[in-house]
Amino acid sequence: AQADAIQQVRDTLDRLVEVANEADLEAVAVTDHDRYHPALSAPVEQRNGVTIVRGIELRVDAGSQRLDLLWYGLEPTAALTAEVERIQQNRIDRGRQLIENVESYLGVDLHLEAREGLGRPHIARAVLESEADYDEFGAVFDDLIGDDGPCFVPRDVPDFETGRELLSEACAFVGLAHPLRYDDPEGALSCC
């Protein structure tokens, strides 16, 4: 199963390069939530005429809000790798608890296992595919697993300074993911 997943990731990366070439893009960045892309082994790679920049999207607690920081040109350090592993274990544990909460609350089996990379969108899709009386993705978040939902389980994320320190040693450039999503976009941008 893991070999199949790794092959699927490689196929997805190959498809990204095809699409970049079709769009006449010279470079693309590849990031994932709180983990490194497993098929990229260097901060910058060339594939079929496309420059691929490896990065990471790391959620941090900035006090007044949680921010998703994008870091590019990633060269993992031991400290960052340890933190990413801790975060991934927390995501698995959180996913398991979310699944249990939703199954108990709705009285259904989601036929979903907690695993690395599992997030609330996966759980929402499982609810839609279950016998539960839901047919809209957003309603699952609004009613069940959103930040104020009865099944919500918070994530354990590093504070801003810890994230900044870990990533400044491992990455060349920083950005803010989806800056207009935040309640205070200017405050979010001022952190970067």
Model regions: which residues?
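Active-site gating loops and adjacent loop-to-helix segments of metal-dependent hydrolytic enzymes
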Residues: 61-86, 129-149
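Generic, low-specificity signal for short hydrophobic/alpha-helical stretches with a mild N-terminal bias
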Residues: 2, 24, 28, 77-80, ...
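Conserved, surface-exposed functional patches that form binding/active-site neighborhoods
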Residues: 46-47, 51-53, 66-101
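An N-terminally biased module of ancient metal coordination in phosphate/nucleic-acid-related enzymes
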Residues: 1-65, 144-146, 170-192
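Domain-core and long-helix interface of multi-subunit machines
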Residues: 1-11, 90-192
